[in-house]
C-alpha cells in the first residue's frame, strides 16, 4: 500500500485496521520526521506495522523540496532531489539506521549510484546535530505543499 502527502501515515493505519497488507510505503526523511503531525503519525504506523509484522518501505529519502520556479529540472523526479554526495550519504544513512526499514531508491538513474554507494558504506546513524546542520545546509522543505 502506498500514498503521498502529510496524511498518508494516518491513512495507512486506517487501511491496516481493515486489510491485512504485507507492506506499507511511506515518505520518510529528516524533514518528514519534524513535520508538525507527520512524524507522530509515521511512528504510530510503524509501531502498528511492527506489531502486525508488516514491512515498512520508505520513499522520498532524497527529497530536498519542490522545484523552484524557473529551475532546470534535470532529474527524473517530481520534486527537487538532493544532489550533493555528502547530503545523499547523510539522508541514506539516517533512514537506514532504523532497523527493519527498506529504502526505496530515488527514481533517477543519475542519482542511483550515489544512493548505492551510501548504502554500501553504511555506518552509524548521523546525530541529530549533524542532521540539523544537513537540513539547514541543504534547504530541506515540504514537497507536499504547506506544512
Please report, for each region that a protein language model flagged, where it lies by residue.
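Beta/alpha (TIM)-barrel catalytic core signal, keyed to glycine-rich beta->alpha loops juxtaposed to Asp/Glu
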Residues: 1-147
Amino acid at each position: 500500500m502506498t500514498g503521498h502527502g502529510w496524511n498518508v501515515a494516518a491513512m495507512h493505519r486506517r487501511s491496516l485496521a481493515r486489510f491485512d497488507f504485507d507492506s506499507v510505503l511511506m515518505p520518510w526523511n529528516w524533514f518528514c520526521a519534524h513535520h508538525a503531525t507527520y512524524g507522530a503519525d509515521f511512528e504510530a504506523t510503524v509501531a502498528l506495522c511492527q506489531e502486525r509484522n508488516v514491512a515498512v518501505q520508505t520513499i522520498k529519502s532524497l527529497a530536498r523540496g519542490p522545484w523552484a520556479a524557473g529551475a532546470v529540472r534535470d532529474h527524473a523526479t517530481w520534486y527537487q532531489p538532493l544532489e550533493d554526495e555528502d547530503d545523499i550519504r547523510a539522508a541514506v544513512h539516517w533512514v537506514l539506521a532504523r532497523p527493519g526499514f527498506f529504502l526505496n531508491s530515488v527514481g533517477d538513474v543519475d542519482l542511483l549510484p550515489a544512493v548505492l554507494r551510501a548504502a554500501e558504506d553504511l555506518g552509524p546513524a548521523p546525530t541529530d546535530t549533524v542532521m540539523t546542520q544537513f537540513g539547514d545546509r541543504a534547504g530541506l522543505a515540504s514537497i507536499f505543499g504547506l506544512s
